[in-house]
């Protein structure tokens, strides 16, 4: 029972609560992952087969977010509130640092993996806002990352299967021979950078709004964090659209002129993911209302 585990400072000394909180925190941020515990994720994604890529992006990372909410926030509400400004700055550092690493990658899988890690930084920022807007945005962001980056890895697997490479410099102009793949990839890329009416727009907006509305004592730090987060979205648009341009829209290389477009099965899978991305982008409340009542209870405890 989570309620019976709630750490009470009258029973447990503060130093003990902080020690246990930090141990849980490190365990879960390795799973998410956050900088500086993130190196395992891009390395595994760059070497793993397509099913493993999709499983990691779609499920494993979210178990870490669940742990942060279920244990660090609910079992240690007072300590989480104490650490909130630090966690918000940590989330911003994660967004910037992972985004910078994504820019310099030559392989598509590593680039997308670092972009995924960068996007998960918005989850930490949202949780640290200590208000319903930020929290709801963080949970929505976690779900959106699972869908969007799973779709990314499906696209990559389709390209890799045909070209036997994932190096950006070795690819080019595939949109001319794989038009279905290009259009579906465009929807996924637009969602990843936060284009309105696609799945990742609403959670990013909610997280940044939650940061601006936050009542944390370090108001200046919070406002700066929100502005940096907004700038990071612009930067992410640059490297994600560079990937799209280089792989699908540049000059078609001679060796790729005979490759085939997506099969009906591949088209069906990617179309289903894109429909989910569009639907929850247009109707975000259809997913937020599922957990909104629970989020209000969690935030009420933190604001006591």
Please annotate each region the language model reported.
Residues 1-205, 209-241:
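Hydrophobic transmembrane alpha-helices and their helix-loop junctions in integral membrane proteins
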């Amino acid at each position: 029972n989570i309620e019976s585990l709630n750490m009470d400072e009258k029973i447990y000394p503060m130093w003990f609560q902080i020690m246990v909180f930090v141990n849980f925190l490190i365990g879960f941020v390795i799973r998410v992952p956050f900088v500086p515990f993130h190196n395992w994720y891009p390395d595994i994604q760059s070497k793993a087969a397509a099913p493993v890529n999709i499983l990691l992006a779609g499920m494993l990372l979210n178990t870490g977010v669940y742990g942060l909410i279920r244990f660090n926030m609910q079992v240690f509400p007072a300590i989480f509130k104490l650490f909130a400004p630090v966690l918000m700055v940590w989330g911003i550092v994660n967004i910037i640092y992972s985004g910078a690493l994504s820019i310099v990658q030559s392989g598509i899988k590593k680039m997308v993996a670092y972009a995924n890690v960068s996007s998960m930084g918005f989850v930490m920022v949202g949780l640290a806002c200590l208000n319903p807007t930020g929290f709801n945005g963080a949970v929505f962001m976690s779900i959106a990352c699972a869908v969007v980056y799973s779709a990314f890895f499906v696209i990559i697997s389709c390209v890799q299967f045909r070209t036997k490479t994932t190096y950006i410099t070795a690819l080019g102009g595939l949109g001319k021979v794989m038009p279905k793949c290009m259009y579906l990839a465009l929807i996924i890329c637009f969602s990843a950078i936060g284009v309105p009416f696609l799945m990742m727009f609403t959670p990013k907006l909610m997280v940044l709004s939650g940061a601006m509305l936050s009542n944390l004592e370090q108001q200046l730090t919070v406002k700066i964090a929100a502005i940096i987060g907004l700038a990071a979205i612009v930067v992410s648009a640059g490297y994600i659209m560079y990937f799209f341009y280089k792989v699908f829209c540049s000059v078609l290389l001679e060796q790729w002129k005979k490759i085939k477009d997506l099969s009906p099965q591949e088209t069906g899978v990617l179309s289903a993911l894109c429909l989910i991305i569009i639907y929850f982008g247009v109707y975000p409340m259809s997913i937020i209302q599922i957990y909104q009542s629970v989020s209000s209870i969690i935030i009420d405890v933190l604001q006591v």
